[in-house]
Swiss-Prot record:
It comes from Aquifex aeolicus (strain VF5). Its EC number is 2.7.4.6. Pfam families: NDK. Disulfide bonds: none annotated. Its cofactor is Mg(2+). This is Nucleoside diphosphate kinase. The lineage of its organism: Bacteria, Pseudomonadati, Aquificota, Aquificia, Aquificales.
Length: 142
């Protein structure tokens, strides 16, 4: 297994629930190092750019509106096989499904449904690279 970096974003619904500390602690307990951390609020334009891969999907506008509805926290996590492991820890996209098949996952614990699912995580090395560079400058990553 190789050491990788991946990006997570704690979404507005989880921020509103006060789940940030518990979510970050989960990744620390799983052995990840936090290499960068930033709180901000997406503008609708920047949210649209970030989620450009979904621009043709019917949920795109709703996603953009949700992601720009409140503060988020982005973090670069580093660890062995980080992309795959983080995706396993966060659970299925739909929080209702996650409660059935991965009840200890972050989305099961803090998400509501498929749209308000608490957390984003990169799904491939290519998306991790794009997303990390989109959110952070090189000087912000240790």
């Amino acid at each position: 297994m190789a050491v990788e970096r991946t990006l997570i974003i704690v979404k507005p619904d989880a921020m509103e629930k006060g789940a940030l500390g518990k979510i970050l602690d989960r990744f620390i307990q799983e052995g990840f190092q936090i290499k960068a951390l930033k709180m901000f609020r997406f503008t609708p334009e920047k949210a649209g750019e970030f989620y450009y891969v979904h621009r043709e999907r019917p949920f795109f506008q709703e996603l953009v509106e949700f992601m720009s509805s409140g503060p988020v926290v982005a973090a670069v996590l580093e660890g062995e096989d980080a992309i795959k492991r983080v995706r396993e820890i966060i659970g299925p996209t739909d929080s209702e499904e996650a409660r059935k098949v991965a009840p200890n996952s972050i989305r099961a614990q803090f998400g509501t449904d498929k749209g308000k699912n608490a957390i984003h995580a990169s799904d491939s090395p290519e998306s991790a690279q794009y997303e990390i560079c989109f959110i952070f400058s090189g000087l912000e990553i240790v």
